[in-house]
């Protein structure tokens, strides 16, 4: 299981950096974006060159040895993706030392409660007045990412890595962060560096396997997970990760077996129990899938996990053709998300309801509500808000283009373009490309549409439109390759299923 990038339990799309920026951040590469964007491992032009420390590790500033012990225990739990347990350790550390900047920073980084994250960010900023320069850079990296200010975040990350080039944990964090931005090759380079420094770094073994899986190199990923299981033989997460990657590779029976092995190690391991539901759903056994989701729900510790499980439960009805029941279930989950004031989930559920709407008018109404939810007061980060708004606008452009409402589609594309210029977030940039590709296709500009759609490779709807245009252009080889890729998509979101089922018939 991955904490930042979950192949199955992820209805909020990944946050990416613009392609040019991603290319520019590879270590020791020449800057490709602009003079304002340093290459990863180089310093920001606006900052003094950071001193290179001979110490391998970033210091941990705290007045309490007990707080430091708890913080480090939390780190190790987090490397094995036991996020709830890690957060509990970090919260306890802040009680021992209320001015523990790194503990507050990690709560910001991995917290699931938006209100807690907002409070932790404020505490971290106050506590950072008395910490080392490296710790201040770590905080800046995290806070700027959380606010959706990616260029500033990269600059801070660059400077921090330049200060501590032999810190395996920072290389690991950089790799995981790049993975969350969709730069899997760059992520793999940093994760491999962490493993060169510490060959038994369990979290890095797991993360590298996911890097490879995201590049569809499943056979190369599996040995790292087997090594991970050797390093952590009593932990369920290595088996859970192996099950998830086998699922993504379409090896569903093997995936079921590995989820069961994980549950033997920890019968209360929520992610593996939910994973069983996902695989049975992919196998077409929706009754059994719902039974497994029902078992998983009481195991969920965080409200977001409960909502994830309930959403998957609802989607199972759509998979068996009972769209009315799926809508009813999603409406029920929406009530719960609203009660918990989880605006990102409210927005996503409206997106799902738009996909299942009885009419285009109803679909657009749900997209209106998805946008309106994001404007409501909440503790949602700027990054999360931009991600959800970008997805809503892309869906609006796609549906409007299909309906021939080119004015509405153009307005959505224009809005996305303004967001790209303001945020430099790649989730926005890719959504803009996908939306513009749909609009250009509707305007009978297939060549331009093809180039745009290629820039949105993780969106199933964009890839389906790409395959259609490639076929119409008599580009049989490319069309076949795109269709094969879609057919091999074993993602578990509603959109994955709605699109991919057409390519498996």
What is the predicted function of each stretch?
Residues 92-95, 126-129, 161-162, 193-197, ...:
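Conserved structural position within tetratricopeptide repeats
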């Amino acid at each position: 299981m991955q904490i930042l990038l979950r192949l199955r339990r992820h209805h909020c799309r990944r946050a990416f950096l613009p392609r040019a920026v991603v290319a520019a951040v590879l270590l020791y590469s020449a800057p490709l974006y602009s003079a304002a964007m340093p290459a990863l491992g180089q310093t920001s032009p606006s900052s003094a060159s950071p001193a290179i420390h001979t110490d391998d590790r970033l210091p941990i500033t705290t007045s309490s040895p007990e707080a430091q012990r708890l913080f480090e225990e939390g780190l190790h739990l987090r490397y094995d993706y036991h996020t709830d347990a890690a957060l509990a350790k970090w919260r306890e550390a802040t009680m021992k030392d209320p001015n523990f900047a790194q503990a507050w920073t990690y709560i910001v980084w991995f917290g699931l409660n938006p209100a807690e994250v907002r409070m932790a960010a404020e505490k971290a900023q106050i506590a950072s007045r008395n910490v080392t320069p490296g710790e201040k850079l770590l905080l800046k990296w995290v806070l700027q990412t959380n606010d959706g200010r990616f260029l500033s975040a990269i600059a801070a990350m660059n400077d921090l890595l330049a200060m501590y080039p032999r810190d395996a944990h920072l290389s690991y964090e950089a790799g995981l962060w790049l993975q969350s931005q969709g730069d899997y090759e760059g992520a793999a380079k940093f994760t491999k560096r962490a493993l060169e420094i510490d060959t038994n770094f369990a979290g890095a073994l797991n993360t590298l396997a996911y890097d490879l899986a995201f590049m569809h190199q499943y056979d190369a990923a599996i040995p790292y997970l087997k090594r991970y299981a050797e390093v952590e033989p009593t932990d369920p997460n290595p088996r859970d990760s192996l099950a998830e990657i086998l699922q993504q590779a379409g090896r569903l029976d093997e995936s079921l077996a590995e989820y069961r092995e994980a549950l033997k190690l920890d019968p209360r391991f929520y992610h593996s129990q939910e994973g069983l539901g996902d695989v049975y759903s992919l196998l077409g056994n929706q009754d059994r899938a719902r039974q497994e989701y029902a078992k998983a729900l009481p195991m969920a510790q965080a409200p977001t996990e409960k909502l994830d499980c309930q959403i998957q439960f609802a989607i199972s009805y759509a998979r068996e053709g009972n769209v009315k029941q799926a809508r009813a279930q999603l409406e029920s989950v929406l009530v719960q998300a609203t009660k918990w004031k989880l605006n990102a989930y409210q927005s996503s559920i409206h997106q799902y309801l738009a996909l299942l709407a009885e009419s285009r008018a109803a679909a657009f109404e749900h997209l209106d509500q998805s946008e309106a939810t994001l404007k409501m007061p909440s503790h949602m980060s700027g990054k999360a808000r931009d991600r959800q708004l970008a997805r809503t606008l892309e869906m609006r452009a796609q549906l409007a283009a299909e309906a021939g409402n080119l004015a509405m589609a153009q307005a959505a594309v224009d809005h996305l373009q303004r967001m790209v210029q303001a945020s430099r977030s790649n989730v926005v940039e890719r959504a803009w490309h996908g939306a513009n590709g749909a609009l250009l296709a509707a305007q009978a500009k297939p060549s331009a549409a093809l180039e745009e759609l290629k820039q949105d490779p993780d969106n199933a709807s964009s890839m389906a439109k790409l395959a259609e245009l490639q076929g119409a252009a008599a580009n049989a080889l490319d069309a076949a390759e795109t269709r094969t890729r879609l057919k091999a998509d074993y993602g578990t979101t509603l959109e994955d299923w709605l699109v991919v089922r057409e390519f498996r018939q």
